[in-house]
Each structure stands twice: as structure tokens, then as C-alpha cells.
Curated annotation (Swiss-Prot):
Keyword Zinc: yes
Keywords in alphabetical order: Cadmium, Copper, Mercury, Metal-binding, Zinc
Keyword Zinc: yes
Gene, per the UniProt record: MtnA
InterPro entries listed in its UniProt record: Metalthion_5
Function: This protein binds cations of several transition elements. It is thought to be involved in detoxification processes.
Biological process, per Gene Ontology: cellular detoxification of metal ion; response to metal ion
Gene Ontology MF terms: metal ion binding
Organism the protein comes from: Drosophila melanogaster
Protein name per the record: Metallothionein-1
Highest rank taxon of the organism: Eukaryota
Domain notes: All cysteine residues are arranged in C-X-C groups. These are thought to be the metal-binding sites in other metallothioneins.
Induction section of the entry: Strongly induced by cadmium, copper and mercury.
Family in the record: Belongs to the metallothionein superfamily. Type 5 family.
Length: 40
């Protein structure tokens, strides 16, 4: 399931409900976390 953080975003640990946190759980394809919509 795609991350709600944004496109190009991958969940490090997918929850059973298929949701992820836009934090350390959010990994971007690039080096910019803002690309995933992460605040950090």
C-alpha cells in the first residue's frame, strides 16, 4: 500500500491497517524527506 505521506514515499514498517507515520517511518526515494511530505 502506498504511504499517505505522499508519492515516492516508502514505509519502513507497515502497520496491519496499511498506514504509516510521516516520521522516521517515512523513507524518501531521494535525500529530501520533504519530498515525502515529512515535517522532519
Amino acid at each position: 500500500m502506498p504511504c499517505p505521506c505522499g508519492s515516492g514515499c516508502k514505509c519502513a514498517s507497515q502497520a496491519t491497517k496499511g498506514s504509516c507515520n510521516c516520521g522516521s517511518d517515512c523513507k524518501c526515494g531521494g535525500d529530501k524527506k520533504s519530498a515525502c511530505g515529512c515535517s522532519e
